[in-house]
């Protein structure tokens, strides 16, 4: 039989199983994070944990956290700080370059149930050492200083649905862009502080799941992708969104969900 680990055989009615993958790799990676100055990579995999690959070339990786592997991050200014998650808001952290890992947060809703998505979107703001993750339709989970064990808190914002995509501005300190499962887009300034402010910059005609956000040559150039069928799946604004408008730029892509979109850093006219 087959599952998310590959192909297996039982000849005794399920008492024992034999791995029949024959070195075939079937693992699905939800995410990867790349070290800023080496060949080191970590990645979260579907039901197969978070794995570390330390050098280039063909090799066997090392599992660093078990269970499901979710979104992974490496601080690009201090690679000692690395993060992964299993499910929901169960976040693991390494403070020594990935040599050891421990549970950093396991944050649940007030009624004790899991909050966020099963594979939960998150993002790092390395400049301000802040960590953000989806939580519920009215709040975003926030860790203001992930270099310490300070208590987490939340950004209060009426999202209308769960946050499904994040992007920290590469241009303006403390600016966080947020997309939602209901097709809305928000810009949060000073997101790492207690005096943050929120503005909605959503397109007027979208209600599908926003799967990614990217920022172009400045904070006014924003790209979003949507994940559904029968819709325009790629939108761009060059005026900051909201009343300044968004343009569908899907072109002749087939009618299928778009999972991620990125600008060409050498030519912001290309996606």
Q: For the regions a protein language model found, what residue spans apply to each?
A:
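Beta-propeller blade termini and top-face loops
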Residues: 1-271
């Amino acid at each position: 039989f087959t599952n998310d680990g590959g192909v297996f055989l039982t000849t005794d009615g399920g008492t024992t199983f034999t791995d029949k993958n024959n070195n075939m790799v079937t693992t699905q990676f939800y995410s990867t994070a790349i070290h800023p100055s080496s060949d080191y990579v970590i990645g979260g995999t579907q039901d197969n944990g978070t794995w570390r690959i330390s050098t280039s070339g063909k090799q066997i990786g090392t599992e660093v956290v078990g269970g499901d592997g979710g979104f992974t991050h490496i601080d690009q200014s201090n690679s000692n700080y690395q993060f992964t998650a299993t499910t929901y808001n169960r976040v693991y952290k390494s403070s020594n370059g990935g040599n050891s890992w421990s549970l950093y947060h396991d944050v649940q809703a007030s009624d004790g149930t899991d909050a966020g998505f099963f594979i939960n979107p998150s993002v790092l703001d390395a400049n301000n050492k802040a960590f953000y993750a989806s939580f519920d339709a009215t709040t975003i989970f926030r860790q203001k200083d992930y270099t310490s064990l300070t208590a987490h808190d939340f950004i209060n914002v009426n999202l209308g649905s769960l946050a499904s995509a994040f992007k920290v501005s590469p241009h303006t300190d403390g600016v966080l862009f947020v997309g939602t499962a209901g097709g809305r887009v928000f810009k949060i300034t000073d997101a790492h502080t207690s005096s943050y402010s929120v503005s909605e910059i959503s397109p007027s005609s979208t209600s599908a799941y926003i799967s990614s956000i990217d920022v172009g040559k400045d904070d006014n150039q924003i790209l979003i992708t949507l994940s559904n069928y029968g819709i325009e799946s790629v939108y761009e604004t060059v005026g900051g969104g909201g009343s300044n408008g968004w343009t569908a730029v899907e072109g002749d892509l087939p009618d299928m969900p778009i999972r991620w979109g990125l600008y060409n850093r050498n030519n912001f006219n290309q996606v």
